[in-house]
UniProtKB/Swiss-Prot annotation:
The gene is kduI. This is 4-deoxy-L-threo-5-hexosulose-uronate ketol-isomerase. The keyword Zinc applies. Its EC number is 5.3.1.17. It holds the Pfam family KduI. It catalyses: 5-dehydro-4-deoxy-D-glucuronate = 3-deoxy-D-glycero-2,5-hexodiulosonate. Keywords: Isomerase, Metal-binding, Zinc. It is an enzyme of class 5 (isomerase). One of its GO terms (molecular function) is 4-deoxy-L-threo-5-hexosulose-uronate ketol-isomerase activity. It comes from Cereibacter sphaeroides (strain ATCC 17025 / ATH 2.4.3). Zn(2+) binds at H192, H194, E199, H241. Its cofactor is Zn(2+).
């Protein structure tokens, strides 16, 4: 069974007026991972689709997604799949890939229906595409690793880049995940914005009662959302996106937009945050 929700884009002036419930309705994504189901959120931020598939013993097939207006989801799109669960398989275009926890699979435009099987918990990301690049499974060992931060600022972390220009080609999808060193809890701090790309975060590896306080909004009008394990949040191009956890966590970041340059950002000075 496939469930699809649509999220319309919002401008920063309107977002300033929202209360907590309104912010969560507009930007927060809960309940993406349900056993025996595919759950998708079609956003109007660069037409990014975000979702989860949990086969739970029976294969799940992702094919037609009506909001895309095509017969099959990958007719004019590319896709990234991250396994945050147990061992599983993903099949498309006559090939099957074995995916362990933390593996990332890239599927190109034209790959046809996608089948998820096994014990995986598959996080799905899809953006419009203009050409077909080769499908590729990227393991953590294959990813490019960038170390940032320091223990003194509680933000020492390793940024693992998977679907990324320095690892493999894609049309506009950029995907990776960030792991923290012991005692560090701040992500993407100092903050930045990138007006040419949207971004979406999925927080996972959180303990049951742990939370991440995710900060968003214009630098001069910040707000926060409280995130649990396996919850996602969409970041508009005009918004900062950073967070602080009450304990250890990992987060997947994914972007789509005008370019795939990870360094194309506008830093925000601490004195400009409100």
């Amino acid at each position: 069974m496939t469930h699809i929700e649509i999220r319309h884009a919002m401008d920063p002036v309107s977002a300033r007026q929202l209360d907590t419930a309104g912010l969560r309705e507009a930007f927060h994504m809960a309940d993406l991972f349900h056993e025996g189901e595919i759950r998708l959120v079609y956003t109007h931020y660069d037409r990014m689709i975000v979702g989860g598939a949990v086969p739970a013993g029976a294969p799940l097939v992702l094919d037609e997604v009506k909001p895309t207006g095509t017969a099959s989801i990958l007719d004019r799109r590319e896709m990234g799949v991250v396994n945050i669960g147990g061992p599983g398989t993903v099949s498309a275009a006559g090939e099957t890939w074995e995916m362990g926890r933390g593996d990332v699979l890239y599927l190109p435009m034209g790959a046809g229906p996608v089948t998820f099987a096994g014990q995986g918990r598959f996080y799905i990301l899809s953006a419009p595409a203009h050409t077909a690049h080769p499908a590729r499974l990227v393991t953590l060992a294959d990813a490019k690793k960038v170390k940032m931060g320091a223990p003194e600022t509680a933000n020492e972390r390793t940024i693992n880049q998977f679907i990324h220009p320095e690892v493999m080609p894609s049309c506009q999808l950029v995907v990776g995940y960030t792991q923290f060193h012991g005692g560090s809890v701040w992500n993407t701090m100092p903050a930045h914005v990138h007006d040419r790309r949207m971004e979406v975060y999925l927080y996972f590896d959180l303990a049951q009662h742990a939370r991440v306080f995710h900060f968003m909004g214009e630098p001069s009008e910040t707000r926060h959302l409280v995130m649990k394990n396996e919850e996602a949040v969409v970041s508009p191009p005009w918004s900062i996106h950073c967070g602080c956890g009450t304990g250890a966590y990992t987060f997947i970041w994914a972007m789509a937009g005008d370019n795939v340059d990870y360094r194309d950002v506008e830093p925000v000075a601490m004195e400009d945050l409100r």
